[in-house]
Amino acid sequence: MNNKGSGLTPAQALGKLDALYEQSVVALRNAIGKYITSGELPDENARKQGLFVYPSLTVTWDGSTTNPPKTRAFGRFTHAGSYTTTITRPTLFRSYLNEQLTLLYQDYGAHISVQPSQHEIPYPYVIDGSELTLDRSMSAGLTRYFPTTELAQIGDETADGIYHPTEFSPLSHFDARRVDFSLARLRHYTGTPVEHFQPFVLFTNYTRYVDEFVRWGCSQILDPDSPYIALSCAGGNWITAETEAPEEAISDLAWKKHQMPAWHLITADGQGITLVNIGVGPSNAKTICDHLAVLRPDVWLMIGHCGGLRESQAIGDYVLAHAYLRDDHVLDAVLPPDIPIPSIAEVQRALYDATKLVSGRPGEEVKQRLRTGTVVTTDDRNWELRYSASALRFNLSRAVAIDMESATIAAQGYRFRVPYGTLLCVSDKPLHGEIKLPGQANRFYEGAISEHLQIGIRAIDLLRAEGDRLHSRKLRTFNEPPFR
């Protein structure tokens, strides 16, 4: 049986999602406006009939498709039945939704339907970006009379596989309430609009990488042969080829207001690069990944500094993580540390090849500077003060480097099915007496940062060319939602 004829096409579904979502947002904003200006309360009966709800998207497969695709990591059904999720910001996610629906519609003959859901849109998510202005005294009344965020309804049970497929079949890893929660947090933490985020993400833990990224990004925008057309900066700066003295415009301190500022090098087709300075520590690393994941990026890479643990390493050498010793502890409750985090072959190869291309060295010379192995991620910046215990554990793990973010980012990529990788640069060798001193640090930074960042950017170029092959089946659970 082919269900196409009795349901919506992907284009029709997207149109209906847009219409239903906009209808609810307008109704909620109008009701809030009336409450603010005249004290008029929202109509309870209208609310019960779905005045402020998210749209719901359902895709049904009857199981009759012969030879369904089995090699791709998404756009697949694990069993016949109906799969449902709620949708927010359909315009923001249009390209993603169209890709996912088209795969299921064309390859499975799936039936697509859109209708109002039972889940109301929390009022804070429609106020931001609107003309509505509130003072502190109004918040209690709004919370009492309008739908608001309820944390008990937000979670990662689907992404973590904590649901029973016979009772509920989710269409995607994140529903609308979870997505809206994270979209609001992303703007708060990074200081940039969520619309500017690009699908290829670099994380760093040092501001100097940001300076280099901005310099390179500005040069790309001015290059007529470059695909990059604009640079969106934390704090609100928007740089194009017409911007006078772009680096001076960016040099203000507005970005310092934000905990994890981001910069977005944008392409016309939305396939650019986002750089996030996550600072130091696994808590920030977990936080930013929790929220970035709802945008369904194509890859995230950690490009930062580490301590080298082997005598044969030199300051400025690179470490390509093949495995992780997770002493960060921030994810233990949802992803126990005894669960292995596999490396992603496509990402590993891209990082290695990019190192060869950027350094201009032949393979044997690259191997002298690029060490592969286990990276320790710790939540204790002063682990050296417990050297006896630390050294024994590191020795058992055969670790080659230590930092405070990489394993957390990789584990979050594993949880949320975002391809991940780590290329670190050795900035000190704490086990061998080579510690960072101010003068040495400055000389190291000046020589290493530009090449290291360029390797990350070149790796993204290689990964972008992979297309859908970048997404790995090894990250799928037994009952994976159809959407990526």
Predicted regions and their residues:
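Accessory terminal and edge-of-domain segments that mediate assembly/interaction
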Residues: 1-299, 307-484
